[in-house]
A protein has these predicted regions:
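C-terminal catalytic "cap/lid" subdomain
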Residues: 1-66, 71-99, 103-368
Length: 368
């Protein structure tokens, strides 16, 4: 039902849907999946496909074992495999008159505000031209320190910057179960999840498929981003024939419901950051002020963790080390180390130059 009401839909495909355990291409599956995308376009929906598989296909072409690859070698393999991946899509989608484009993203493209806006503009223009973007992480240049790490989180960030109505993660299971169904026969599918609590975290499977880099844990991480961005997210079985049609007709999947009905685009971007650069631990007085919609001042800061620059994403933590909010810092970490615990009227004196008094302005902050 959530899919039917969605205008912009992001669909993530795992490597295991492209290439099976015997390293054979799932040509029939791709052809059927193209019919699903064709149907969504007929319903006037904007569709984005986030597809894994570049490294797996590169390994297949070069006859390499993915598990033995080091980062620098995997980057080269990814550049080879990305061509193979796009050729597969082109072969199966062009016959159904589906126009395709390719977008390769790095972490900074969604984490830096200006680049995120530019990326959204590109996507919007592609929708106007009736093209379906195929998105992947730019593994050939991304380093381990600046990677999404898996395409589940990449897909959730793409959904977030596009203000997409829903994200569908196609996997090799029907959704999230009360127990791992591959081990426990009494495991039951959870149809809807409103809150990702400790129990949900616990039941999330940590199993990893032969070709993928993620598991159920990364899908839960993606769901958290979607919930805080106002988007619906589904985990569904992609191995079924016509998986999107199956969601439409049977809704046999797990839906994560958004926590936030509406946030402006700027605050969505702030709250959904994958990699905040630091933490500010604040006192009870500061927490009470923030609850009333006030800005964070230096006087309420007890401690600081991490090194960051002005404008970077940071977490605001209470005395019990619980995350209360996220925001954009008005100061760098060195400056905050000097002014923490001080009254605002002393900041200019301490730093030796005139600056603002708010460490995190209320307009640059979102409560978790």
């Amino acid at each position: 039902m959530y899919l039917k009401d969605s205008k912009t839909v992001v669909i993530k495909i795992g490597s295991s849907l492209i290439i099976n355990e015997s390293k054979s291409i799932r040509e029939k599956w791709l052809s059927d999946f193209a019919l699903d995308i064709q149907n969504l376009q007929k319903l006037k929906k904007n569709v984005i496909i986030v597809s894994s598989g570049a490294i797996a296909l590169g390994c297949k072409k070069l006859r390499l074992n993915k598990k033995n690859l080091k980062l620098d070698k995997s980057q080269a393999v990814a550049s080879i495999g990305q061509i193979e991946l796009m050729n597969l899509f082109k072969k199966n989608f062009n016959s159904k008159k589906i126009n395709l484009s390719q977008i390769l993203l790095t972490l900074e493209d969604t984490e830096q505000r200006r680049r995120a806006i530019n990326a959204k503009r590109t996507f919007d223009n592609l929708f106007e031209l009736n093209f379906v973007p195929i998105v992947n992480e730019n593994d050939s240049i991304a380093t381990s320190e600046i990677k999404y790490g898996d395409n589940d989180r990449l897909a959730s960030r793409v959904a977030q910057i596009l203000n997409a109505d829903c994200l569908i993660l196609l996997s090799d299971v029907d959704g999230l179960y009360t127990k791992n169904p591959k081990i426990h026969k009494d495991g039951k599918l959870i149809k809807e999840i409103k809150n990702i609590d400790a129990k949900i975290e616990q039941v999330a499977s940590k199993s990893i498929g032969m070709h993928g880099t993620g598991g159920m844990k990364t899908k839960i991480d993606a769901a958290k981003i979607c919930q805080l961005s106002g988007s619906y997210m589904a985990i569904a079985n992609g191995l079924l024939e016509r998986p999107i049609k199956n969601i439409y007709q049977k809704n046999n999947c797990t839906w994560f419901l958004p926590k936030i009905s509406k946030l402006d685009a700027r605050k969505k971007w702030i709250i959904s950051s994958i990699s905040p650069k630091g933490k500010l631990i604040v006192d009870d007085g500061a927490i009470n002020a923030l609850k009333k919609g006030k800005s964070l001042l230096a006087a309420g800061i007890i401690n600081i963790e991490g090194k960051f620059s002005k404008g970077d994403h940071i977490k605001i933590i209470d005395r019990n080390l619980n995350e209360f909010a996220r925001g954009l810092s008005s100061f760098n970490s060195n400056e905050i180390s000097k002014i923490k615990g001080q009254h605002s009227n002393r900041i200019n004196e301490i730093l030796g130059y005139v600056t603002k008094s708010e460490v995190v302005h209320k307009d640059d902050m979102v409560e978790i």
